[in-house]
């Protein structure tokens, strides 16, 4: 049986942190002038994959 291959796009977007999968935050790459400093600071906080998507992300990362 061939080796499982990690989805390379997913590998670049998600990082494994202890028992959680860390992900990036959307809406922080451009059009930042209309967003308040408080809102932009909130976008820098770490985000984690929710339980509904956890199994599918684990399959992409060959962790299942």
Curated annotation (Swiss-Prot):
Recorded name of the encoding gene: rpmI
Single GO MF descriptor: structural constituent of ribosome
Bilayer-crossing regions: none
Keywords: Ribonucleoprotein, Ribosomal protein
SUPFAM superfamilies with a match to the protein in the record: L35p-like
Full protein name: Large ribosomal subunit protein bL35
HAMAP family: Ribosomal_bL35
NCBIfam families xref list: rpmI_bact
GO cellular component: a single term: cytosolic large ribosomal subunit
Xref: PROSITE patterns: RIBOSOMAL_L35 (PS00936)
Entries under Pfam families matching the protein: Ribosomal_L35p (PF01632)
